[in-house]
Amino acid sequence: YAKVDCSVFMNVTARLSLRLVPADLRSQPLFLCIDDTMVSKFGKEFEDVSKLFDHAAHNGSHYLNGHCFVSLMLCMPVWNRDKISYLAVPLGYRMWKKKESKLVLASAMVRQVMPEFHAQKNVIILCDSWYVKQNLVSVVEEYENPELIGNARADSVIYDLAPLPTGRKGRPAKHGRRLSIDSDFTLSAEKAGDYYTGYRCVLTNI
């Protein structure tokens, strides 16, 4: 195989894609979506094939032989019959070979393309709960414009914000009381799609 760094093609794709965003939609958010997918193989002689755990399998077994790819996709706004529609453009894929974690692969891809978004004001990274960990959160803190939206694990411990200083001696509290997702959140009266929604600033460990 040629020893060529193909990651530069991610930058080229992102740069060309951003040119397609209409001028009157450039204030709309851009989404960088992170996910991973598995490709099963029936043979065992394929290069880098391995036994993988598939939590979404419906074949009676949660394991399969195949490859796992981490993907980064750009979703950008365009006009479609006078309505805003988001166009999905794949930026890059990395095969997970178990030498590096999927978090490391995802973080590296985001860092690779972020220079192309330096002039964008509203960049949002979307991912599921598996990626909401320090490796990826630290990338968000390295740049001025990105934000991150991700699912929290169902067993995540969440706390109220730290109380105001009391002036008493001793170390101030780092967080407030522990919160319950069942009783400490005010949800909307009506569903948004399939879900009730609510908002509250909290603290958690990731």
Q: Which residues does each PLM region occupy?
A:
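Major-groove recognition helix of helix-turn-helix-like DNA-binding domains
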Residues: 1-2, 125
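An internal, acidic/charged active-site-proximal segment
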Residues: 94-206
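Active-site-proximal, Lys/Arg-enriched surface segment
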Residues: 2-85, 91-92, 195-206
